[in-house]
Amino acid sequence: MNKIIFGMVVCALALAGCGHDTFFDEPEETIVHTPPDNDPALEKLETNVGYYYGDKDGDLTRYEFAYRAAGQYCIFPKTEAREQELNRLSQQEDSRVKNMGGFYLVTRSRNFITGDDFVSDRYFINYYRGEPEFVVICPMIIVRVDNSEAKDKILKKYRGKLTQSDRSGQGEMPGGYYLYKFDCHLSTSEQALNLADEIYKRNDVTWAETNKYAPIHFDI
């Protein structure tokens, strides 16, 4: 039976540990928000790109809360309705499920970035509402330029804020343009969005966006 399970891919590291005692260091109700049953995010769950910020089309509106995560996982709110399916997921060989303070952390898909891939010591992620889904902003900016010299100029200008990522899929693309991924050494997703917007306005940049995730759809 096909099921749609609410999930968020959170691309941030705030705490070194992933145990129950270290996942939340603030009262849970101040940093966790469970969308209502009629939330559009529950209707279609998949990775998402194409949102802009500031003066771009499809502006994002800051949602109600910020939170910190102990790694890069899919976070499922624990409810009785989902308990049976999550228990079944936990028995599958390609699934890793951990119950942490009323939440299940599930890594089961190639779309997920594992908890071993840490990105910063403390990075606060705001929860943004796009249409029709919400968006999680990751501390990485992806930039398209016409030549490799533009990459060097960007790194020089934003020294201390950006470094080139060691991820694959960079350099000259088949279409003759260049694509680069920059890790952000910032404190908040708001700063990452603002920096991407600033880079986007450069004459030597075709486009620039933060790496981001919307919910994921599972057929289970």
For the regions a protein language model found, what residue spans apply to each?
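Low-complexity intrinsically disordered segments
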Residues: M1-N2, P27
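Sec-dependent signal peptide recognition
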Residues: N2-M8
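Residue-level signal for mature regions of secreted extracellular proteins and peptides
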Residues: C11-A12
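C-terminal motif of bacterial Sec signal peptides marking the signal peptidase cleavage site
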Residues: L15-G17
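Sec-dependent signal peptide cleavage junction
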Residues: G19-D21
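Primarily auto-inhibitory N-terminal propeptides
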Residues: D25-I220
